[in-house]
Design a protein with these regions (language model features):
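A conserved mid-protein helix/loop that constitutes part of the nucleotide-sugar donor-binding site
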Residues: 39-46, 231-245
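Glycosyltransferase donor-sugar binding loop
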Residues: 63-67, 250-267, 282-285
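Short His-centered aromatic/hydrophobic patch
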Residues: 111-116, 134-135
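Membrane-proximal helix-turn-helix segments that form the acceptor-binding/catalytic region
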Residues: 138, 149-179
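Aromatic "clamp/platform" in nucleotide-sugar-dependent glycosyltransferases that forms part
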Residues: 306
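Short hydrophobic beta-strand element within catalytic cores of glycosyltransferases
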Residues: 323-333
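A charged, aromatic-enriched C-terminal amphipathic alpha-helix characteristic of glycosyltransferases
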Residues: 363-398
Length: 403
């Protein structure tokens, strides 16, 4: 330990930068450097790495332990540059990762969830703190009694008790600042990490790019969309079956297969081109202006997932007056700005009629739809702007760095 502390102190002494050095722990960067496209990576790349660095804060992205490839010896880290941010994969050998971290002398860690413990286990400074941003805590009972009810196909269970125990231990050592994107997630986090109810958890809502110039136009809102990766827990096949049974409406799938592609395509085979119903279109992954235009024309977002936190896709859609019809609820967002059809366990095909009733209501009742759509737009502008996110997250970073 004294050796690594000496390395850190020497490195800090000769550092030209006096900024707060933040290491962002994540396992994806929304396609950057060949990583996966997902909600955590989206937050990391599009918001934290883009808007938090300033004259007082600098951020590196740590993507865990590097893989065995490229011919690079296992004692070296791997570095790439993306969007003006350095992305690092640590050496495969723990001693050299600990040495590398000491030389980098980060002031604190920031993690969107915590999907891997390699970096924190290699950190030899037992005073260094972690800001843990809760997005989607999943206790073991959730895997067993909810996600585990799926029969035809399942995503692998990524429950890892050793990570949750590490978080518990760091909390006992007063080395963690918990923040959450939704207050309804707090009981789940307390259960997952075996924490006391008195543990403080600060509210830091997820940000989205909000078009404040957008003006709601009822005449544009005529499509029904699915927005997300085509993976088992998302259960896109329910959306597709709804489309097949409701040919009077236009349905659009926005998202790609990424993990376990063959299994997921097999589950979806009767709905994919060329077998897809005429009113069901697959757009693949979309971003930028194309995505904005599709959201502007969407009247309803259908969420068929068996489990989620609070998806970024919800907030993006709400900002354009697209209401949500969902099989799960978080922070009362669905009830306020759409309709909760009730819990849907298993593969979910028996829920199609519940979705159909709600869809008909919002496609045909303009008065109800406009009321909830306009309220949704106002809500997102008041609570999920980049300006508010920057102020809140920077305050958290400064307070933890000074503590």
């Amino acid at each position: 330990m004294p050796f690594f502390k000496m390395i850190e102190n020497v490195s800090r002494h000769f550092s030209k930068s006096k900024k707060i050095r933040v290491a962002l722990l994540i396992d994806e960067f929304f396609g950057g450097a060949g990583t996966a496209y997902g909600g955590y990576g989206f937050l990391a790349r599009k918001f934290i790495a883009k808007y938090i660095p300033d004259e007082d804060i600098e951020i590196d992205v740590l993507l865990g332990k590097r893989e065995k490839k490229g011919g690079l010896p296992s004692i070296f880290a791997l570095k790439e540059h993306c969007d003006n941010v350095d992305l690092h994969w640590l050496p495969r050998r723990k001693f050299f990762s600990s040495l590398w971290l000491a030389a980098k002398h980060y002031d604190l860690y920031l993690s969107i969830e915590l999907t891997d413990d390699y970096v924190l286990k290699c950190e030899k400074n037992d005073k260094k703190k972690l800001i843990l941003w809760r997005q989607d805590p999943r206790p073991k009972r959730v895997w067993k009694t909810i996600i585990g009810t799926m029969k035809s196909i399942k995503d692998p269970c990524f429950y890892r008790q050793e990570i949750y125990q590490l978080v518990h231990d760091m909390n006992e050592e007063k080395r963690i600042k918990f923040i959450t994107q939704g207050n309804s997630l707090n009981p789940l986090a307390l259960e997952l990490y075996n924490l006391e109810n008195t543990v403080p958890i600060s509210y830091v809502p997820n940000p989205i790019e909000i078009d404040f110039e957008y003006r709601f136009n009822l005449n544009q809102k005529n499509t029904i969309i699915f927005l997300g990766r085509l993976e088992a827990q998302k259960r896109c096949w329910i959306f597709c079956e709804i489309a097949r049974q409701m040919p009077q409406y236009n349905f659009i799938v926005l998202g790609n297969f990424f993990r376990h592609i063959d299994d997921n395509k097999k589950m979806m085979r009767e709905y994919l081109p060329p077998n897809n119903p005429k009113n069901l279109i697959f757009k693949g992954h979309v971003d930028g202006e194309e995505k904005k235009e599709l959201l502007k024309s969407a009247r309803i977002l259908i969420n068929t997932s068996i489990w989620e936190g609070i998806p970024i896709s919800w907030l993006e859609c709400l900002s354009y007056g697209t209401v949500i019809i969902s099989a799960f609820e978080r922070d009362d967002l669905v009830s306020r700005f759409g309709e909760y059809v009730g819990e849907v366990p298993g593969d979910g095909f028996d829920s199609v009629n519940r979705f159909k009733i709600a869809i008909d209501e919002y496609m045909n009742n303009d008065e109800l739809y406009v009321l909830k759509a306009t309220q949704a737009i106002e809500y997102t502008r008041s609570n999920h702007s980049i300006k508010k996110f920057k102020e809140t997250m920077k305050h958290v970073i400064h307070s933890v760095a000074k503590d």
